[in-house]
Amino acid sequence: MAQEGKAYIHLALAIYYAGGKIDEETLKKAAEAIGMQVDEAKIKMLVASLEEVNLEEVLKQAVAAPVAAAAAAPAAAPAAEEKAEEEKKEEEEEKKEEEVDLSGLSGMFGF
């Protein structure tokens, strides 16, 4: 059922991008054209809801939102790089300590 509701929204967006008017008749024809079972109550609710919405503004905001989130991500990257470098240094120090320990043992056994 939820998928059907999304299908009506997708139809409305397709009509919008095609430059058509989003009204009950156009949505009904589009739904029939793709073989959907028409639910006139859902179509009426969607059209009523969209009358209160400026689709152009909503779509501009939706496109801009991921860009803003992506711009914030690089700021976190240096901290992650520093942490990775610290971990790498710690691992190298541990390896050196192990090598020292092993070299002592190898000296004892003539290796």
From Swiss-Prot:
One biological process term in Gene Ontology: translational elongation
InterPro entries (UniProt xref): P1/P2_N_sf, Ribosomal_P1/P2, Ribosomal_P1_arc
GO CC entries: ribonucleoprotein complex; ribosome
Region (Disordered): 75-111
Cytoplasm found in the keyword field: no
A GO molecular function held by the record: structural constituent of ribosome
Alphabetic keyword roster: Ribonucleoprotein, Ribosomal protein
Residue spans of biased composition, Acidic residues class: 88-101
Family the entry assigns: Belongs to the eukaryotic ribosomal protein P1/P2 family.
Job of this protein: Forms part of the ribosomal stalk, playing a central role in the interaction of the ribosome with GTP-bound translation factors.
Assembly and interaction partners: Part of the 50S ribosomal subunit. Homodimer, it forms part of the ribosomal stalk which helps the ribosome interact with GTP-bound translation factors. Forms a heptameric uL10/P0(P1)2(P1)2(P1)2 complex, where uL10/P0 forms an elongated spine to which the P1 dimers bind in a sequential fashion.
Protein name: Large ribosomal subunit protein P1
Organism: Aeropyrum pernix (strain ATCC 700893 / DSM 11879 / JCM 9820 / NBRC 100138 / K1)
Gene for this chain: rpl12
